[in-house]
């Protein structure tokens, strides 16, 4: 499975769907989906019960596929790639105008 460049708390840019072009903060990461705050909001109807005698409608954020979001750096969608250094460190780097800059450490390789 491909490594995810998006983590909880990151700001992402939506590439496809009804909320295309919007930005939001990642609340949860699932296997190949992410839940973004205020994006892809669905209405859930709650049945009548003793706690809710009239029933209720609540808004929940539905998950988006990971391919439909891109990490937002400086309010622009950014493409990231993994670079392995001589010491075995895996780093997320981003391309910008021909140069690359470090964004986040992925992991340290042993050995």
UniProtKB/Swiss-Prot annotation:
Part of the 50S ribosomal subunit. GO terms for biological process: translation. GO terms for cellular component: ribonucleoprotein complex; ribosome. CDD domains: KOW_RPL26 (cd06089). PROSITE patterns: RIBOSOMAL_L24. InterPro entries: KOW (IPR005824), Rib_uL2_dom2 (IPR014722), Ribosomal_uL24 (IPR003256), Ribosomal_uL24_CS (IPR005825), Ribosomal_uL24_KOW (IPR041988), Translation_prot_SH3-like_sf (IPR008991). SUPFAM superfamilies: Translation proteins SH3-like domain. Belongs to the universal ribosomal protein uL24 family. One of two assembly initiator proteins, it binds directly to the 5'-end of the 23S rRNA, where it nucleates assembly of the 50S subunit. One of the proteins that surrounds the polypeptide exit tunnel on the outside of the subunit. This is Large ribosomal subunit protein uL24. GO terms for molecular function: rRNA binding; structural constituent of ribosome. The gene is rplX. Keywords: Ribonucleoprotein, Ribosomal protein, RNA-binding, rRNA-binding.
């Amino acid at each position: 499975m491909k490594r995810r460049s998006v983590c909880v708390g990151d700001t992402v840019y939506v590439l496809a769907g009804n909320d295309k072009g919007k930005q939001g903060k990642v609340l949860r990461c699932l296997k190949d989906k992410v839940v973004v705050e205020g994006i892809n909001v669905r209405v859930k109807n709650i049945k009548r019960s003793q706690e809710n005698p009239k029933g209720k409608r609540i808004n929940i954020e539905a998950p988006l596929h990971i391919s439909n979001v891109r990490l937002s750096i400086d309010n622009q969608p950014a493409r990231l790639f993994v670079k392995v250094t001589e010491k075995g460190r895996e780093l997320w780097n981003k391309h910008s105008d021909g140069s690359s800059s470090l964004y986040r450490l992925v992991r340290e390789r042993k050995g």
